Amino acid sequence: EYARREEDGFSKAKYSRFNPVQLFLLQSRERALLHLLRKHGITDLSNLSICEIGCGSGGVLQEIQALGASPDKLSGVDLLYPRLLEARFRLPLALLTWADGQSLPFLSNSFDLVLQFTAFSSILSPQVKQAMAAEIMRVLQPHGILISYDFWLNPTNPQTNGIPPKEIAALFPHCVLEFHKITLAPPLARIVVPFSWPLAMMLESLKIFNSHYLVFIQKK
């Protein structure tokens, strides 16, 4: 799915911050992430070791760096090498590795914080998801945190498979989990945002039109 997007010029414009709809979605997600971290007493990322599973071209890690994470404490893995090369150009101090989420090239208990932003939904095999979840738990320190951001339903794309709260809970059975339904469904956002940004924010606040879950998952 990500390889297809990489080759699709229209998709590049669609996911650009110069697209008002994409900007709305990204800023909304960032506000929700900051609120969640603050709620759990995390207001300084500079001393945290952080890894993203499925880091792509580095966009999310750049956002995390902008929030105060130390560039040399960032790590990431991805299977698409061209995207990884772009991430290395953007984040020269980060440790970015061509690797599979089922076999992470890190020691156990390596990270304070792990991120997965729409990696699970791009995996169609339940066994692969389970293996990746186990690896995430392995590399997290005791009481370490996984932040998961993924959609629970995407009926328009057969190359992805939404991951609802019940499935996330099954993947991380011995963890503390907290779910927040966020992100105005992109098809609706594409209609509403160009017409009225405040209306889009109001609709998103209702949650019934939201397509993603932001999940705080803490290892016991």
Q: Each PLM stretch: what is its role?
A:
Residues 26-46, 63:
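Conserved alpha-helix/loop element of class I SAM-dependent methyltransferases that forms part
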Residues 160-175, 179-180:
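Short alpha-helix
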Residues 1-16:
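N-terminal, positively charged/glycine-rich alpha-helical extensions of SAM-dependent methyltransferases
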Residues 130-142:
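A short glycine-rich, Lys/Arg-flanked "PGG" loop and its adjoining helix->strand segment in the class I
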Residues 143-150:
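Conserved beta-strand signature within the Rossmann-like core of class I S-adenosyl-L-methionine
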